[in-house]
Amino acid sequence: MKRIYSYNNQEHILYLVATPIGNLEDMTFRAVNVLKSVDRIYAEDTRNSKVLLERYDIKTPLYTYHEFNKELKEDEIVDFIKKGASVAIISDAGLPVISDPGFDIAKRCIKEDIPVTPIPGASAGISALIASGLPPKPFMFYGFLDSKTTKRKQELEALKYLPYTT
């Protein structure tokens, strides 16, 4: 992975941009600036993302990138970045990659020596932790539980014995 010495908006880069998790005013100045300056934004659900982009007068072209098309979109995104473009990935709420699309494209970009820069912001897991009254150390984020009841019960049973706030 390449070390980045400047955090000014760049070309040939993938940004993973955090979005608000419930209040549109939780959007950071930096996130707005990045989304205005990139060549394309790829979003989990463009219908949800349009509300955010309109709120901050972001006119950057918006494309879909989600669980069901990510394999098709990876080549498109990587090729676009290699031609000199900058791209941002956003999820519906919170941080891309964390229980949302983004891991595969970030991994691919790193493999191809394309810089990947996170633009931090709201995080549901950390927000819940700091308001919970539970010990913050050690802490483990597990992610979404399985949608199937039997599997979900098995996951919860295994998690309850961990020595972490989970």
Where do the model's predicted regions map?
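Glycine-rich, flexible N-terminal cofactor/catalytic loop recognition
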Residues: 1-68
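Short active-site oxyanion
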Residues: 35-41, 113-117, 166
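Short phosphate-binding loop-to-helix
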Residues: 67-82, 101
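Short glycine-cluster motifs
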Residues: 83-140
